[in-house]
Each structure stands twice: as C-alpha cells, then as structure tokens.
Amino acid sequence: GSSVRPFRMYNALVNLGYDVKLLEGQQNRRKERQAKVKEIINWLDENKPDICYVEPPSGPFFNQIDISLLKKVHNMGVPIGLFYRDFYWRFSKWAWKGTPLWKQSILKMMHRRDLAAFKKYCDVVYFPSQECTKVLADVKFKEIGILPPGCNEPKGGVKLGAREIFYAGG
C-alpha cells in the first residue's frame, strides 16, 4: 500500500549511510501533525538538508502547515522531489460515488491547491508510471519523473480478463 514506498525509501537511504530527518504523522491528527511539522521547521532554522523527498497523504493536505513547510524548504534552495500517486479524485466516475456535492467541491479545491503548491515548490514530481502522467498532463510541473512502486516485481506476465479496471490503492 501507500506505506511501502516510504518505508523502503527510508531504509535504502539509511542503509546507504545517509542521515535522514524523517517527518511522519497522520493528517487527521491535527495537533500532533502540526507539532511534528513545527519541529522540522525549527530544525531547518539550524540545518540545511541536501535534498527533500515528499510522500503526500492519500488525499489533500488538511494542514496548511505542510504547504508552509514545502515553501520554506523551497525558499532555502533545497531541491524537492515529490511522489504523487493519489490522483483518483480526477476520475469522477469512481472517486465521488456517494459523496455529497458540497464535500466534493471542498476536496477538489484542496487537491487543486496542493497541485498548485507542488507545481510551484517541487523541482521534480514523480509518478508510478508514464501512463499516470497523462492524468495530470494539464499541470505543468517543472520536471516529471517515474518512480515505480515499492514492491517486488512479479515473475512472468500478469493476465487480466477485465476490459476496464480502476484501482485506488492505499
């Protein structure tokens, strides 16, 4: 799921001997999240990392402080790479079934706000595959990269009999 890649990325960097400052925490635990982000912001007042890698939540940022953190890191001149996988909200046919219109409107607005921040502050936005980049072709990111899923590749081909599949993992 959505926790596999961050776990593997973190372990790979640590195993390569890098010092990694980790920010983790759930968006829906507002006070805890804000405290953890403030701790990183304070750390950044005394430290400048070489790079910043971001795995956004599966959904929009609910805490404005996360976008403020991206802005601070960007303004420090630290290159930011962000992995974007949760664009299911762009598929109205599946994403919003049973969701009240008022809630759809608010969440879509928050997703668009996040995309604008990613476009402005991130040096490269990574997607799981080249095919995924087509979903957001209208957003002109500075650079796009491909970062395959953090899983073991299956041996042999995978055959599916379905004509249409929509999978929103996590």
Where are these regions (language model features)?
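Conserved donor-binding/catalytic core segment of Leloir-type glycosyltransferases
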Residues: 155-170
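Short N-terminal targeting/anchoring amphipathic segment
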Residues: 42-66, 77-83, 124
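Glycine-rich, highly charged phosphate/nucleotide-binding loops
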Residues: 29-47
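Active-site proximal beta-strand in glycosyltransferases
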Residues: 51-52, 71-94, 99-105
